[in-house]
């Protein structure tokens, strides 16, 4: 049986020749698939793909609209200084939210270390974002770089995590859709890839 590495090499060779490689499994871009399979671990290939989309948008600092300095070394670890739960873990835990829904790629944003550790901590989004709104006159545009397209519509000012979760899933779904060349196999339902396991397990802040 041909190894996965050998298969990948053949596919890359096809891409280099401007040919479309074939895959044996379907790719789902639906919001429901993201919600069901987005538990956060920086070692999972599925999560890495979505993190690449986040980074592609050059996320900016909530507080001053400057581009976040993304450290490639830290991005390999789920406890990275760059990873922030937009609805903080401590805040959602107090509301008895399910852990798998708290520690989810849809709740992850890429920020700088100072912002994550000292400015946000366990505050609700409406509280810490109100502070940033006064400091950052471009906050609405800043948040679009995090694929949070509208603070009201995403339930941020109402601290509505369920609404935020749904809305961000829709946006991430659209972003994945833009990058996928649909093939016949994609007509089949996708199941989570069995070997999409984390390389290492860490806790996020």
PLM regions: where:
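Intrinsically disordered, low-complexity N-proximal targeting/linker segments that flank membranes
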Residues: 1-83, 91
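Short Cys/His-centered divalent metal-binding micro-motifs
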Residues: 102-104, 108-134
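C-terminal, well-folded lobe of enzymatic/effector domains
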Residues: 140-205
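Non-catalytic, well-ordered alpha-helical scaffold segments
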Residues: 48, 106-109, 170
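A broadly conserved detector of short glycine/acidic/proline-rich loop/turn motifs that flank catalytic sites
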Residues: 57, 87, 92-93, 114-116
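Histidine-centered nuclease catalytic patch
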Residues: 73-107, 124
């Amino acid at each position: 049986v041909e190894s996965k590495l050998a298969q990948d090499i053949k596919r890359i060779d096809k891409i280099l020749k401007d040919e479309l490689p074939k895959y044996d499994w379907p790719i789902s871009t639906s919001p429901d698939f993201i919600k069901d399979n987005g538990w956060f671990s920086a070692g999972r290939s599925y999560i890495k793909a979505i993190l690449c989309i986040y980074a592609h948008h050059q996320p900016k600092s909530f507080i001053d609209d400057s581009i976040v300095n993304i450290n490639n070394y830290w991005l390999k670890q789920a406890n990275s200084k760059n990873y922030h739960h937009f609805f903080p873990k401590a805040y959602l835990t107090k509301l008895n939210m399910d852990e798998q829904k708290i520690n989810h790629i849809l709740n992850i944003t890429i920020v700088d270390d100072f912002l994550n550790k000292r400015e946000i901590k366990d505050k609700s989004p409406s509280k810490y974002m109100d502070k940033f709104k006064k400091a950052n006159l471009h906050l609405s545009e800043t948040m679009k770089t995090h694929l949070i397209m509208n603070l009201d519509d995403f339930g941020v000012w109402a601290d509505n995590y369920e609404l935020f979760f749904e809305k961000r899933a829709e946006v991430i779904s659209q972003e994945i859709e833009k990058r996928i060349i649909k093939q016949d196999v994609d007509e089949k339902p996708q199941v989570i890839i069995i070997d999409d396991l984390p390389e290492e397990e860490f806790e996020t802040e």
